[in-house]
Regions:
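Sec-dependent N-terminal signal peptides
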Residues: 4-14
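Mid-length scaffold segments of soluble, non-membrane domains
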Residues: 68, 81-143
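Helix-loop segments that flank and shape redox-cofactor active sites
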Residues: 49-54, 77-87
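A structured, mid-to-C-terminal "fold-capping" secondary-structure block
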Residues: 22, 123, 128-227
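Cationic, glycine-rich low-complexity segments
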Residues: 23, 29-45, 49
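N-terminal, post-signal-peptide region of Sec/Tat-exported proteins
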Residues: 40-73
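Boundary at the C-terminal end of the N-terminal hydrophobic targeting segment
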Residues: 17-21
Length: 227
């Protein structure tokens, strides 16, 4: 019980520390309210309907297709971080899934032992020591930082979607990506503890640190096993 209490204490303290780099908090809180309204009125109903009418194997397949397209961008960012082996593995994943996996609908590559990675240009900047900068709540998109927001620009140009040269298709894929993502996170609102704004901000930074360090985050609780 003491260990659990300590965990929540650390989360609370982290929120206070992160608040020091939040000069746009007033605007961010307003944006969060707008995002919650948009989510309640549009995103959640559409995602709920999508989840109800879409068979599980189709839903998984759609996720796989979107994930497969992202492997090109992931590969380039791995290479930019000097992780050549991982970058080549991402290219192999894309090739295998695009051919044997029917355009990525079936994740054949994972079954072959080709691990799925998670990289973007924001993480690449972080890898090379660029700090997050101010916390930003983006309208319609959610939590971000100045660094990660800037990173979205090259990520957009590195995505194979722009090669389609057909705006309706590009926007349809993006919309489907957003709805599929929202559907997979339905119900998570119940885990929010305390001030929702601070909770989301802290969770965002913790998640980005985990991603940037490839999961190799120092465990602060190794010395608390006796609690």
């Amino acid at each position: 019980m003491k260990k659990v209490s300590f965990v929540f204490l650390v989360v609370a303290l982290n929120s206070v520390v992160l608040g020091e780099n939040d000069p746009f908090e007033e605007i961010n809180r307003t944006t969060l309210k707008i995002n919650k309204t948009l989510d309640a009125v549009i995103a959640t109903p559409v995602a709920t309907l999508y989840q109800k009418v879409t068979p599980d194997f189709i839903e998984v397949g759609i996720y796989n297709v979107i994930s497969n397209v992202d492997d090109i961008n992931i590969s380039l960012n791995n290479i930019l971080q000097g992780k050549i082996k991982e970058g080549l593995s991402d290219i192999a994943r894309f090739t295998v899934n695009s051919t044997l996996g029917l355009g990525g609908f079936i994740d054949v590559a994972s079954k072959m032992g080709l691990q799925k990675h998670n990289e973007d240009f924001g993480q690449t900047l972080g890898f090379w020591g660029v700090p997050h900068g101010p916390y930003i709540m983006l309208p319609g998109l959610g939590p971000s930082s100045l660094r990660d927001t800037v990173g979205m620009i090259p990520d957009a140009f590195l995505s194979p979607r722009i090669l389609l040269n057909h705006e309706p298709t590009i926007y349809s894929l993006k919309f489907l990506d957003l709805i599929d993502t929202r559907a997979r996170y339905l119900g998570l609102e119940s885990i929010v503890i305390g001030d929702e704004y601070l909770f989301i901000k802290d969770a965002y930074y913790q998640n980005r640190e985990f991603d940037t360090l490839d999961g190799e985050v120092e465990d602060d609780f190794d010395n608390w096993d006796d609690f």
